[in-house]
Amino acid sequence: MRHLEKPIRVAVHYCVVRSDVCDGWDVFIGVTLIGMFISYYLYALISICRKGEGLTTSNG
């Protein structure tokens, strides 16, 4: 997840510096998109781990 830190930091920095441009809706949409992306990322990791466990248990 380290590769996600820099874009998020840049987005937050841009939002803070350009506070006149960044209103409540921008923050809401940004947080929603980041939350959706992180939840999808975690779901993919969990499904991969479960497939790995299924393979090891089926081998015997």
Swiss-Prot record:
<keyword id="KW-1043">Host membrane</keyword>
<protein>
    <recommendedName>
        <fullName>Protein P7</fullName>
    </recommendedName>
</protein>
<dbReference type="GO" id="GO:0033644">
    <property type="term" value="C:host cell membrane"/>
</dbReference>
<keyword id="KW-0472">Membrane</keyword>
<feature type="transmembrane region" description="Helical">
    <location>
        <begin position="28"/>
        <end position="48"/>
    </location>
</feature>
<dbReference type="GO" id="GO:0016020">
    <property type="term" value="C:membrane"/>
</dbReference>
<keyword id="KW-1133">Transmembrane helix</keyword>
<keyword id="KW-0812">Transmembrane</keyword>
